[in-house]
From Swiss-Prot:
Database matches in InterPro entries: Amidase, Amidase_CS, Amidase_dom, AS_sf, GatA
GO biological process, one term: translation
GO cellular component, as recorded: glutamyl-tRNA(Gln) amidotransferase complex
Active site: 81, 156, 180
Name of protein: Glutamyl-tRNA(Gln) amidotransferase subunit A
Annotated organism of origin: Mycolicibacterium paratuberculosis (strain ATCC BAA-968 / K-10)
Highest taxon listed in the record's lineage: Bacteria
Role summary: Allows the formation of correctly charged Gln-tRNA(Gln) through the transamidation of misacylated Glu-tRNA(Gln) in organisms which lack glutaminyl-tRNA synthetase. The reaction takes place in the presence of glutamine and ATP through an activated gamma-phospho-Glu-tRNA(Gln).
PANTHER family referenced in this protein's UniProt entry, alphabetically: GLUTAMYL-TRNA(GLN) AMIDOTRANSFERASE SUBUNIT A, TRANSAMIDASE
Length: 493
């Protein structure tokens, strides 16, 4: 393995700017690693070697000419979740219904990455339309966890997390609807952040559940994640839900956190996310992390979020309802797959045949649940009640933040489970999102940072850090301080 690919993104960027390395060298090293390992891990759905090397060459030309580089990450390659549109690569969302489809426009996140001089290596595997917790729902086959190829890497963004853990890329982009960035990060010993809702544009992010979806950064260190966060965040007039507010100084917070001083920082432990139902090794790792935060000077106390116990039920009414609405656009008429278009079927039959063939079982399940919840006789009983619970969950967190600065919990109830273990048990799969989805309902920000390996099975465990809306910098200060105190972990490969 080329040692270049083991470097963190900040180091690579500094070496590229100093002419110690070229962006083409770094990008080629990543492409070589993908070629050597992706048959084993299946992290990528599409590799854009020529496009990535072309973007890298542009950065190298700027360095050679002594020009100012467009960002602190210029020249460092990245893996992009296949839910963000790209004009020069297919965007499939892990679904047969979009197989081979190319968007006529770039997502805002894609545009920002290109403008920052970040070569895009390709598009990563994911659960179909971001619905799942294991990346087993991809129409193109599952991604395998580099820590143990018989285990899942989490989902829906398991491809991005696996690419980081396998040293195929130093940076990645994911999307988080109920934990799809944080949960895979926890299972692969990487760092993943769900920014405050509305602070990273959703323009060009193919919608799963519009009020929950949020793009975010992933990397192997907290500082690298902060540097990428700074690139992709910001107001966008093309996204009606975009927040017109200054981006918090996440990079400054991450750098400050490495000093390891959390004196005066108030940390809350969620009572409802600590106790029964967790793997013993996960709980042991979490308690050790809380002790470490205390040793760094943080003031730790327990906080009560009584409505968290209803979060799972509310989420799995709100999300399918939005899915039912959003996925109605895949009607076989405008783009994507079309079945039965031979003149012998009506338009309605073509639509039915196409959706039956193009959508996988989990997507169909959620469409049916959502359509039922939105039906005239059940709208008030289900969807409206779920929205009321959502408000109560947000109020629980608001009340907690009156007495603490951040809230912590395990990122997942167990370590990575086996491939095929939960695929036929939707409820068990849904329960795996227990720790992460309340944050999406509230619209706040959260991070998963590696907290070691479980003594149960020697697999990664994640510490989840949560903060109020527009206080993303708090995540980075606490996360970086904890990361520095925890010390280095061994890698997956």
């Amino acid at each position: 393995m080329n040692e270049i690919i083991r470097s963190d993104a900040a180091t690579l960027a500094a070496r590229i700017a100093a002419k110690e390395l070229s962006s083409v060298e770094v990008t080629q090293a990543c492409l070589d690693q993908i070629a050597a390992t992706d048959e084993r891990y299946h992290a990528f759905l599409h590799v854009a070697a020529d496009e990535a090397l072309g973007a890298a060459a542009v950065v190298d030309e700027a360095v050679a000419a002594g020009e100012r580089l467009p960002s602190p990450l210029a020249g460092v390659p990245l893996a992009l979740k296949d839910v963000f549109t790209t004009v020069d690569m297919p965007t499939t969302c892990g679904s047969k219904i979009l197989q081979g489809w190319r968007s006529p426009y770039d997502a805002t996140v894609t545009t920002k990455l290109r403008a920052a001089g970040i070569p895009i290596l390709g598009k990563t595997n994911m659960d179909e339309f971001a619905m799942g917790s294991s990346t087993e729902n991809s129409a193109y086959g599952p991604t395998r966890n580099p820590w143990n190829v018989e285990r899942v890497p989490g989902g829906s963004g398991g491809g991005s997390a696996a690419a980081l853990a396998a040293f195929q890329a130093p940076l990645a982009i994911g999307s988080d609807t109920g934990g799809s960035i944080r949960q895979p990060a926890a299972l692969t010993a990487t760092v993943g952040v769900k920014p405050t809702y509305g602070t990273v544009s959703r323009y060009g992010l193919v919608a799963c559940a519009s009020s929950l979806d949020q793009g975010g950064p992933c990397a192997r260190t907290v500082l690298d994640t902060a540097l990428l966060h700074q690139v992709i965040a910001g107001h966008d007039i093309r996204d009606s839900t975009s927040v017109d507010a200054p981006v918090p100084d996440v990079v400054g917070a991450a750098r400050a956190g490495t000093a390891g001083d959390l004196k005066g920082v108030r940390v809350g432990v969620v009572k409802q996310l600590r106790g029964e139902g967790y793997q013993p090794g996960v709980l042991a790792s979490f308690e050790a992390a809380v002790e470490q935060l205390t040793a760094l000077g943080a003031e730790v106390s327990e906080v009560d979020c009584p409505h968290f116990e209803y979060a799972l039920a509310a989420y799995y009414l709100i999300l399918p309802s939005e899915v039912s609405s959003n996925l109605a656009r895949f009607d076989a008429m405008r783009y994507g797959l079309r079945i039965g278009d031979d003149g012998s079927h009506s338009a309605e039959e073509v639509m039915a045949l196409t959706r039956a063939a193009g959508f996988g079982p989990e997507v169909k399940r959620r469409i049916m649940i959502g359509t039922y919840a939105l039906s005239a006789g059940y709208y008030d009983a289900y969807y409206n009640q779920a929205q009321k619970v959502r408000t109560l969950i947000a109020r629980d967190l608001d009340a907690a933040y009156e007495s603490v600065d951040v809230v912590v919990s395990p990122a997942t109830p167990t370590t990575a489970f086996g491939l095929g273990e939960k695929v036929d048990d939707p409820l068990a799969m849904y329960l795996f999102d227990l720790c992460t989805l309340p944050l999406n309902l509230a619209g706040n920000c959260g991070m998963s940072v590696p907290s070691g390996l479980s003594p149960d099975d020697d697999l990664p465990v994640g510490l989840q850090i949560m903060a109020p809306a527009l206080a993303d910098d708090r995540l980075y200060r606490v996360g970086a301080a904890y990361e520095a105190a925890r010390g280095p972990l061994r890698s997956a490969i």
